[in-house]
């Protein structure tokens, strides 16, 4: 605090590509997460950390901070500072609203970086997903594919992937796969290679095991997602802190 007030601060910090998060102890007041701050402890977010990883990192930090806060209250040597005093200049406060199904449904028209961070921020729960349908049969009920772990495919690596499968150019949402070792989906400026996934009705598995039972992957396509619009809703236009 004061950043990421709301229901899902860990998730949104990862979704937004932050490099630093932390734990805060604070006083309760009439509004949500706005009370005076007592203690704060930082925690680094590594480039491949998921929300689950950060949760596990923060647990021992939070436990120790609670002990220190209680001791400070008992000994009456802890100060409380208003949250406004932690805001630097024109710094914008980012919210952490409830995670919705619309946020979890991946919009492949977004950038590789944004999709990668979205998937990390929703893993392992509630989990980002895409919907698959056979090409030319878009009226059929789609199959949901949950996505737990990925890698970014950008620049020369992306061009090499296209060359490997005999493509010159692709539209966002196009499935790219050799049917054996990789399963990727094109974004606005590259692709996301999916490493750990779960098809509806199946167990969670890694890519090679998935492809062993998912024939002709490039004969499928994805449905339109909603995550990009949901992320835009959560992006503050200005600092509304008074």
Protein language model annotation of sequence segments:
Residues 88-242:
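Internal anion-binding site segments
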Residues 1-95:
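Donor/substrate-binding cores of folate-linked one-carbon enzymes
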């Amino acid at each position: 605090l004061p950043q990421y007030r709301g229901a899902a601060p860990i998730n949104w910090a990862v979704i937004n590509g932050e490099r630093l998060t932390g734990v805060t102890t604070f006083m309760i007041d009439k509004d949500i997460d706005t009370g005076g701050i007592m203690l704060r402890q930082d925690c680094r977010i590594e480039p491949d950390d998921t929300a689950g990883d950060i949760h596990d990192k923060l647990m021992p930090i939070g436990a120790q901070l609670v002990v220190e806060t209680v001791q400070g209250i008992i000994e009456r040597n802890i100060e409380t500072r208003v949250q406004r005093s932690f805001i630097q200049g024109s710094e914008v406060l980012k919210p952490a609203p409830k995670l919705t199904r619309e946020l979890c449904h991946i919009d492949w028209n977004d950038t590789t970086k944004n999709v990668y961070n979205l998937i990390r921020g929703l893993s392992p729960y509630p989990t980002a997903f895409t919907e698959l349908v056979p090409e030319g049969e878009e009226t059929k009920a789609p199959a949901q594919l949950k996505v737990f772990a990925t890698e970014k495919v950008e620049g020369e690596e992306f061009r090499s992937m296209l060359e490997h499968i005999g493509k010159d150019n692709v539209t966002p949402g196009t499935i790219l796969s050799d049917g054996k070792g990789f399963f990727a989906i094109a974004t606005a400026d590259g692709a996301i290679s999916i490493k750990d996934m779960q098809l509806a009705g199946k167990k969670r598995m890694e890519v090679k095991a998935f492809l062993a039972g998912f024939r002709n992957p490039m004969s499928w396509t994805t449905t339109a997602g909603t995550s990009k619009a949901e992320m835009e809703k959560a992006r503050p236009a200005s600092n509304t802190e008074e």
